[in-house]
Amino acid sequence: MHQLVLIRHGESTWNLENRFTGWTDVPLTPTGVSQALSAGRLLKAEGYMFDLACTSVLQRAIHTLWHVLDEMDCSWLPVVGDWRLNERHYGALQGLNKADMARQYGADQVLLWRRSYDTPPPALAVSDPRCERNDRRYAGVPAVPLTECLKDTVARVLPFWTQVIAPAIVSGKRVVLVAHGNSIRALVKYLDRIAEADIVGLNIPNAIPLVYELDANLSPIRHYYLGDADAAAQAAAAVAAQGQA
């Protein structure tokens, strides 16, 4: 049996302010740091060990990983950072308050933008100062997106799974992935074969380790959140409520 551990980053400043974040590189809050440290302590207490860590190129995920590994006494662990694990790009919504958008456009429209499979938000203009196309961390990216739906996020996350994560697991490595709500949703959709119409109901809470037990073909045997299951469910429900006016 193989294991894979998925962790969404700890609370960020824009999580706290209920803003669409996407590719905007915002830091963790003190609560987010505490959440990451708690995740690391929990993993250590439960006896987890890793051989490879994967994360995005956004600091809220990178720093969450650092805190997790530090608490596990394995800051030396090899880390693969890749833009393909970034959060879904929220286009022109980035920086805007979710509740304000729900009041302006309606909760149903905001839910589509946040959680549907194939409805992207309005695109960010190339001339917009928020556009990441001049950010040197993306110099090697063929086409930096101006907006994404979850379908687009799946299209970049799955090649990373195929090229990096799956071969590492098959070779016997224990992998931890620290990323974002939607890049993790993309991977979970693939692993659990969740239908496009059902993915709207999936919410990933901050900094609670999600463990997947996989068979020899990397098909899930079961998955579960470490720690208090009720607390994880409440945290996921809080994420779902962020788009309400």
Curated annotation (Swiss-Prot):
GO terms for biological process: gluconeogenesis; glycolytic process. SMART domains: PGAM. Substrate binds at residues 8-15, 21-22, 60, 87-90, 98, 114-115, 181-182. The record marks 180 as: Transition state stabilizer. InterPro entries: His_Pase_superF_clade-1, His_PPase_superfam, PG/BPGM_mutase_AS, Phosphogly_mut1. One of its GO terms (molecular function) is phosphoglycerate mutase activity. Pathway: Carbohydrate degradation; glycolysis; pyruvate from D-glyceraldehyde 3-phosphate: step 3/5. Pfam families: His_Phos_1 (PF00300). Keywords: Gluconeogenesis, Glycolysis, Isomerase. It catalyses: (2R)-2-phosphoglycerate = (2R)-3-phosphoglycerate. NCBIfam families: pgm_1 (TIGR01258), PRK14115.1 (NF010713). Homodimer. This is 2,3-bisphosphoglycerate-dependent phosphoglycerate mutase. It comes from Verminephrobacter eiseniae (strain EF01-2). The gene is gpmA.
